[in-house]
Amino acid sequence: MNWRRIVWLLALVTLPTLAEETPLQLALRGAQHDQLYQLSSSGVTKVSVLPDTLNTPLGSLWKLYVYAWLEDTHQPEQPYQCRGNSPEEVYCCQAGESITRDTALVRSCGLYFAPQRLHIGADMWGQYWQQRQAPAWLASLTTLKPETSVTVKSLLDSLATLPAQNKAQEVLLDVVLDEAKIGVASMLGSRVRVKTWSWFADDKQEIRQGGFAGWLTDGTPLWVTGSGTSKTVLTRYATALNRVLPVPTQVASGQCVLVDLFARYPLKKVTEEKSTTAVKPKIG
């Protein structure tokens, strides 16, 4: 067989793959101006001022805004009942089960947050966000959908002033702590409270892009995008993000994580150092 032909065929196979592997982009709100970082899996490759023209699809982030509205307007809980009628229920619950608001946000259950199911009218929605000087894309239910393209700057603006964001941040900590995202919790800890998102890159059904958006522990808004799904982005770049994301110097009250570690792994015995003798219980 002609070896030149083989090499040529291999090049055709690998070139599209290489083209899809774009650097991770991280937008971070700054005191003077917003920063845009480009990262490889090994670290930062470029830092610049965030362009006003950089766009992103909303993806699953629209659910975060519905969640904020529900919380801020004190809407009663309306659990979604899974009946096995929709393939989208894979993000929600098993047939015969139900899902509530907080869990739906973490799992990205779009069926729960559907405005029609929650009886959210276009007028009440628009008035609510207009009063808060939200971007035009957020004040319209017709544009609150995954394919809507918005500027990253306007997205960061909306996150900076999002109602009920303290509650959202508390709930979204579970996204990073998800044991299915191997290595993410050990790298990022509780430094980020984010809603994941995924969509089609440049509207091409065969190419996925994803990431997340939310806040650092101190409330600083951030946005991330990369090739692949949000889970792929988190697991692939957790180490690189660990190097660039700031570590909080102070932890506010209420930001600790309650873990029932010893309920699952009870202690059998506590011994003194270099001894097999059990330590007797004592106070002080």
For each predicted feature, which ranges?
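Bacterial N-terminal signal peptides that target proteins for export
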Residues: 1-7
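Bacterial N-terminal signal peptides
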Residues: 7-14
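Beta-lactamase-like hydrolase cores
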Residues: 15-52
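Structured C-terminal helix/loop/strand segments within mature extracytoplasmic catalytic/sensor domains
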Residues: 20-24, 98, 115-123, 163-181, ...
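Active-site-adjacent helix/loop patches that line small-molecule binding or acyl-intermediate pockets
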Residues: 22-24, 28, 32, 80-171
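Extracytoplasmic
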Residues: 23, 31, 51-53, 57, ...
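Active-site SXXK
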Residues: 55-78, 104
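Short, hydrophobic/aromatic-rich segments at coil-to-beta transitions
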Residues: 189-198
